[in-house]
């Protein structure tokens, strides 16, 4: 994506984007490759206004981990008469829930390690584009840097892709029910779920120390950074300095798996019990 930005160009990125993405973009901006504007993706007026001044717009929708959603169609419509390139990280939505190219985006990226592969055993990314010059840029980069997946990774990702619809339907149904229950629990300050996907973000009472206690107390839900696998995982996100300031200090990101929803809820409940009943 960075190769698509002209020298001294401008990049738009969500304030609460994935920390690895923000780190890379901010580092390149500090080195003078381009300038960067960080925007609130849920403020459509601000976002569309920023598009008019940008060379590349990087959109996560939903964002990781705050689960903010952007009006992707409005962004693509605003960029269409311009030379602005719209890049969408579609990891959380997957092609089954959102198809950015059909809405007018130029490039779509996926962390295929997550829902597409679905078993927490692959390190792989995917880039999809309908833009021929962009494709040629990516192909040159792939050839020169050796960014080619191994045979085993390709096999495992293909295996996972075959069951994506089944896994996503089950995990999504679990996530909807867990969100409903979390939202009514008195120990939860708020719970956010965009209505699709497998990830819930929430905060508990008493701040980040309480969040650490909760996530360390689970037995079924794995205390880990990864997401999108068949197993449920969670963590407090602001454990590292690299996490964006827009991410609340006590935010817990719960990636919901395909286990029985009652088993997941029972474990979440007993973990929340460390805060009292």
Regions found by a protein language model. Name each.
Residues 194-252, 256, 270:
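Conserved C-terminal alpha-helix-loop-beta "cap" of PLP-dependent enzymes
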Residues 171, 177, 213, 263, ...:
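Long, highly charged amphipathic alpha-helices
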Residues 134-135, 164, 207-210, 241, ...:
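Short, acidic Gly/Pro/Ser/Thr-rich loop/turn segments
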Residues 1-187, 192:
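Conserved PLP-enzyme active-site core in the AAT-like
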Residues 19, 26-27, 32, 42, ...:
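PLP-dependent enzyme catalytic core of the Aspartate aminotransferase-like
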Residues 177-183, 222-223, 262-264:
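Short amphipathic alpha-helical segments with coiled-coil-like heptad repeat character
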């Amino acid at each position: 994506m960075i190769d698509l930005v002209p020298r001294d160009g401008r990049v738009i990125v969500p304030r609460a984007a994935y920390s690895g993405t923000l780190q890379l973009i901010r580092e390149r901006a500090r080195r003078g490759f381009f300038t960067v504007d960080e925007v609130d993706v849920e403020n459509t007026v601000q976002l569309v206004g920023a598009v008019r001044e940008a060379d590349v717009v990087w959109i996560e929708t939903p964002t990781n981990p705050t689960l903010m959603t952007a009006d992707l169609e409005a962004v693509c419509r605003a960029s269409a008469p311009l030379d602005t390139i719209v890049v969408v990280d579609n990891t959380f939505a997957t092609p089954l829930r959102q198809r950015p190219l059909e809405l007018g985006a130029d490039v779509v990226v996926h962390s295929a390690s997550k829902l597409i592969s679905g078993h927490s055993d692959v390190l792989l990314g995917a880039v999809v584009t309908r833009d021929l010059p962009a494709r040629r840029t990516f192909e040159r980069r792939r050839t020169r840097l050796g960014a080619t997946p191994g045979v085993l990774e390709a096999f495992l990702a293909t295996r996972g892709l075959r069951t994506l619809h089944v896994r996503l339907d089950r995990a999504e149904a679990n996530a909807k029910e867990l969100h409903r229950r979390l939202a009514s629990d008195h120990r939860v300050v708020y719970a956010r779920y965009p209505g699709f996907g497998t990830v819930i973000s929430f905060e508990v009472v008493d701040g980040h120390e309480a969040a650490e206690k909760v996530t360390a107390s689970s037995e079924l839900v794995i205390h880990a950074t990864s997401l999108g696998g068949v197993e449920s995982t969670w963590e407090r996100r602001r454990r590292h300095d690299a996490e964006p300031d827009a991410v609340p200090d006590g935010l817990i990101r719960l990636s919901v798996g395909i286990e029985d929803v009652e088993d997941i809820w029972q474990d979440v409940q007993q973990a929340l019990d460390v805060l009292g009943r």
